[in-house]
């Protein structure tokens, strides 16, 4: 059995959690650390000692390995701010905008910047962490164009041409679902799913999204998550599924803009949910490799090294 030596320590440090990987040159994880302290939960001065304590064993065994971090760790409220790179932004622009966070024990941590864009009205949009995943997907698939979907609390739909992110939109799908379910009248009749394979409610919600015609129709269709329960048209455990399908379906219809295929990047369960909704709506969503963040960080590290030569 061949041994792949570690090439870097990859850190995906978001708002509420952290994952670190001891990775080889192909982005495969040789070891993994998960922690529940997000970048925004720490005060200034706490990030470096916290990360150093998590990575101490790896750095003791591999003292010269570079450490690359992406996500909210580079936000203004994070460890060290890595200002947004403006679209269009590809590997060269993102690698050139990385920032080194000082750390004697870690040898400095290279932080990947986020990316900013403006829509047709001039309204700004931002992402942090997703740009690294997009770069990783591009490297894995060896192509330089396409639509990339990154579902989550704040889902992103990124458009790539010539290897550069030329624009993207954020949809508050995950956060809107949680808020409506947990803090409005819609959640009062909802119950946890009994059978994870039961898709009646989810499919009904996606179908409802496909029928939306006017901007306010989504708000009307959302209220059906209550009335379907009141009149027994859906069991309690399918009401949240209906709401999820409605919001995910509305996002896909808005984000796809008539495009019939895209690449989806994210956690397997969420990717599968989007893939199912896309199939109902005629949009083929193909999953990207699970290690896109690490692959993107490898590309950024190489790009930064090349720029320095």
For each predicted feature, which ranges?
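Short glycine-aspartate micro-motif
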Residues: 8-12, 66-68, 146-150, 263-264
């Amino acid at each position: 059995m061949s041994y792949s030596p570690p090439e870097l320590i990859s850190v995906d440090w978001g708002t509420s959690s952290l994952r670190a990987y001891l990775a080889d040159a192909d982005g495969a994880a040789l070891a993994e650390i998960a922690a529940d302290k997000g970048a925004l939960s720490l005060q200034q001065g706490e990030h470096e000692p916290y990360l150093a304590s998590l990575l101490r064993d790896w750095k003791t065994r591999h003292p010269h390995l570079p450490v690359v971090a992406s996500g909210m760790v580079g936000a203004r409220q994070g460890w060290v701010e890595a200002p947004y790179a403006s679209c269009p932004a590809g590997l060269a622009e993102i690698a050139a905008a990385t920032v080194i966070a000082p750390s004697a024990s870690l040898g400095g941590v290279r932080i990947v910047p986020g990316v900013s864009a403006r829509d047709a009205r001039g309204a700004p949009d931002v992402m942090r962490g997703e740009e690294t995943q997009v770069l990783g997907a591009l490297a894995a698939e060896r192509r330089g164009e396409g639509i990339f979907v990154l579902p989550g609390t704040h889902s992103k739909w990124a458009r790539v041409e010539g290897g550069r992110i030329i624009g993207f939109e954020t949809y508050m799908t995950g956060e809107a679902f949680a808020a409506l379910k947990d803090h409005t009248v819609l959640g009062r009749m909802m119950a946890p799913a009994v059978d994870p394979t039961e898709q009646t409610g989810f499919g009904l919600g996606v179908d409802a999204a496909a029928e939306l015609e006017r901007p306010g129709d989504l708000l009307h269709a959302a209220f059906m998550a209550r009335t379907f329960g009141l009149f027994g048209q859906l069991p309690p455990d399918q009401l949240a599924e209906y709401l999820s399908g409605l919001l995910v379906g509305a996002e896909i219809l808005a984000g796809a803009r008539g495009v019939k295929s895209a690449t989806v990047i994210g956690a397997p369960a969420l990717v599968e949910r989007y893939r199912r909704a896309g199939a109902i709506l005629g949009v083929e969503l193909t999953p990207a490799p699970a290690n896109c963040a690490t692959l993107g960080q490898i590309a950024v590290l190489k790009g930064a090294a090349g720029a320095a030569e």
